[in-house]
């Protein structure tokens, strides 16, 4: 089994859903900025890339229709480079990277682009596809299958006795750490400009 390594990383800044600077940016376009920057930093010849695996939790709108393939084309990769989409909700991007690593470790591929993209502003709005979006059999037999992330968090919190004030304290600590890291320039090499 081969060892998979990450040659380079890149990402866009995080925007504010519905009111930020990316609120009308299509998902393939958003992903392309990070993909192009990562490929450039890696020094890999785009012709050598064997797959683009992208994760997205809400695969509709411009995030639908195989976001991996759309991101590859938007990034200017050769048309022979295929793409693949992964939906594992919040872990979609991480799972895409893991799948790419497994392809390399199992000697199925040599060079893979993996990552995630989400444009909440363009998929969770008044135009979201909610028409018959839940299976009746599942609703009748396993009604919690469509539980939202917020409901899941509440359930986990109650089950394990994690109080709200402790969660808030942890979240605030995380925000402080992020702000400090940004101030100290720790993210400067990985965040790419989107114009």
Language-model segments: residues:
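Claisen-condensing/thiolase-fold acyl-transfer catalytic domains that form or cleave C-C bonds
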Residues: 59, 66, 70-73, 77, ...
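Conserved "HGTGT" condensation-loop signature of ketosynthase/thiolase-family condensing enzymes
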Residues: 1-81, 117-195
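Hydrophobic alpha-helical hairpins/lids featuring a short glycine-rich hinge
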Residues: 95-127
